[in-house]
A protein has these predicted regions:
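Helix-loop-helix hairpins and the membrane-proximal interhelical loops
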Residues: 1-60, 133, 137-140, 191-299, ...
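Transmembrane alpha-helix interface/packing and boundary motifs in multi-pass membrane proteins
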Residues: 27-41, 70-83, 158-163, 258-269, ...
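Transmembrane helix-bundle signature of multi-pass membrane transporters/permeases
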Residues: 31, 47-50, 64-72, 113-118, ...
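Short helix-coil transition sites and intra-membrane helix breaks within transmembrane domains
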Residues: 33-42, 80-91, 123-127, 263-273, ...
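Re-entrant/interfacial helical elements at transmembrane boundaries that shape
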Residues: 41-51, 64, 79-99, 130, ...
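Membrane-interface alpha-helices at helix entry/exit sites of multi-pass transporters
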Residues: 58-62, 99-116, 288-303, 330-333, ...
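A structural-propensity feature for long, helix-poor, extended segments
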Residues: 68-79, 86, 298-324, 328, ...
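Membrane-embedded alpha-helical modules
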Residues: 111-227, 341-494
Length: 499
């Protein structure tokens, strides 16, 4: 009952005119970002962090949340019409969605994607509403050893999952940890790794690193290395579904949601695995004529299931972010930085210290899902027109936003220099397949992990055995080892079978 009352209070905040406008703006911008290939919600949120620094925190987080799940809706549009996924999570949608478009059923594909996203997003939000407070209630009982191990778990999962190589992921993480050490020592107050530069005494701004690695690096990499995308010509039919489409889509939506929701809750989740699993499930369950459409005319289940799985995963990913402070994707890593930009640390205490903010954010998820359904079904033609924006103008606009935002934080020319140095490093990282999200996670969680490690060692009087004295600590150590070793074991088994 307490949860219901808190949610009602959250609706009271989220339904204010100001917050509704921010939610609408975020959903519209998120959809546009999802439609435009190569930009993504992580880049957009990173770019807007400095610009929204003076905005009320509740309005700002509702705005960022709108961008976050709005991009998932928009990503399906280009996947279906142009075979160009706006988001990596929409890759599976393109497999059947584009074939449907080429066979004259673009309208049905877009409709099942939008409605499926709404169904999965709403169910996912219910899961967040019911389970996030429970996770927070248990997590608040953890001590410094458990908190330190949770952060190590965040380091290992982000490094292992967000890159093609665990080694590259760990290398990126250690870069972030090293950058996070720059500035004043939290205990002694002595400067560390500043190189005698006064500008480094307060450390390097997280926002600066996020904007440099995501926005600036994205643009520079696209300009330097990416070729022109060849667009396919698919006519946009009326967005609707007949009775047969509904009959085939509804079970696929529910199955996709059931597959995607758990993946969002676990630190090693991600959207790629559940969307592929959903596609494989739908293809396996299809029979007769429905099965024959897979890979040929395009099967509607192959769009409905993966889109539902995608949006369920994206929504429930807020559970580990809000309750444990663990990001499971590039965008949630940037959202973690957004909270810190306002001096708030996501974790078990968030539901007590910032309850009004959390429940307004959860309420905005329900509101945003309805907004996105309205935005995506009737206005799909408008979103497709965004693809006509010339790439040079689009990239120039992103760089201008990033530069103005970075300079506006401290009016420092040194920050601008640092922004483009970080951007250049980001280009090199992308070129050699080093993931950038672990850098941001290392920067944010590194100092916090250091503080918890010192507290744990103080409690244990300098003995490392403090980390194996409680069942939760032992369980977390087992999970960390599993996350590091499981991918190698699976690859080894696959290699043996192939041999």
């Amino acid at each position: 009952m307490d949860t219901f009352n808190l949610l009602l209070q959250g609706f009271g905040t989220a339904l204010s005119l100001t917050n509704l406008l921010w939610a609408l703006f975020g959903c519209a911008l998120g959809t546009a970002v999802g439609v435009l290939p190569g930009i993504g919600p992580a880049t957009t949120v990173a770019m807007l962090l400095p610009i929204t620094a003076k905005v009320d925190i509740t309005a700002s987080m509702i705005f960022f949340a709108g961008i976050y799940y709005g991009a998932m809706y928009g990503g399906s549009t280009t996947s279906i019409l142009l075979n160009t996924p706006g988001e990596t999570a929409s890759m599976v949608t393109a497999m059947e969605g584009n074939k449907m478009a080429k066979s004259g059923r673009a309208g049905q594909a877009l409709a099942t994607a939008a409605i499926g996203s709404f169904v999965a997003g709403t169910i996912g939000t219910v899961v967040v509403t019911l389970f996030a407070p429970v996770v927070a209630e248990y997590a608040v009982k953890l001590g410094p050893p458990e908190y330190f191990l949770l952060m190590v778990l965040a380091f290992t999962t982000v490094s292992a999952v967000l890159g093609k190589s665990t080694v590259r992921g760990l290398a990126a993480l250690f870069i972030g940890l090293a950058v996070g050490l720059i500035g004043m020592d939290q205990i002694s107050g002595q400067p560390r790794y500043t190189g005698g530069k006064a500008e480094f005494l307060d450390g390097i701004e997280i926002v600066l690193v996020a904007v440099g690695l995501f926005a600036v690096a994205e643009v520079l990499h696209a300009v330097l290395f990416e070729g022109k995308i060849v667009e396919t010509q698919n006519r946009l039919t009326r967005v609707h579904m007949d009775k047969r489409d509904w009959r085939r889509s509804i079970p696929a939506w529910l199955r996709g949601t059931a597959i995607g929701a758990p993946f969002g809750c676990i630190p090693a989740g991600g959207t790629e695995i559940p969307t592929f699993l959903s596609y494989a499930t739908e293809k396996k369950l299809a029979k007769g004529e429905d099965r024959a459409e897979f890979g040929h005319q395009g099967a509607i289940e192959g769009v409905a299931g993966p889109e539902a799985a995608n949006n369920a995963t994206v929504t429930t990913a807020l559970i580990p972010l809000l309750t444990l402070g663990i990001p499971t994707s590039n965008t949630t890593a940037i959202l973690l930085g957004a909270f810190q930009n306002y001096g708030i640390q996501p974790g078990p205490q968030l539901f007590t210290t910032s309850a009004a903010l959390v429940w307004a954010l959860v309420a905005s998820l329900y509101i945003g899902n309805i907004m996105l359904l309205v935005l995506n079904l009737p206005m799909v033609g408008l979103w497709v027109k965004l693809l006509r924006i010339p790439k040079p103008q689009l990239y120039a606009g992103i760089l201008i936003f990033a530069t103005v935002g970075a300079y506006g934080m401290r009016q420092s020319s040194f920050d601008l220099f640092l922004l483009y140095v970080i951007g250049a490093i980001g280009v090199v990282m992308r070129r050699f397949d080093f993931p950038t999200a672990p850098v941001v996670v290392g920067m944010i969680l590194g100092p916090l992990a250091e503080a918890q490690l010192r507290n744990a060692m103080s409690i244990g009087e300098g003995k490392w055995s403090v980390f194996v004295e409680r069942p939760v600590s032992i369980f977390l150590i087992v999970v960390i080892v599993t996350v590091l070793l499981l991918p190698r074991i699976l690859r080894w088994r696959a290699a043996r079978r192939a041999a």
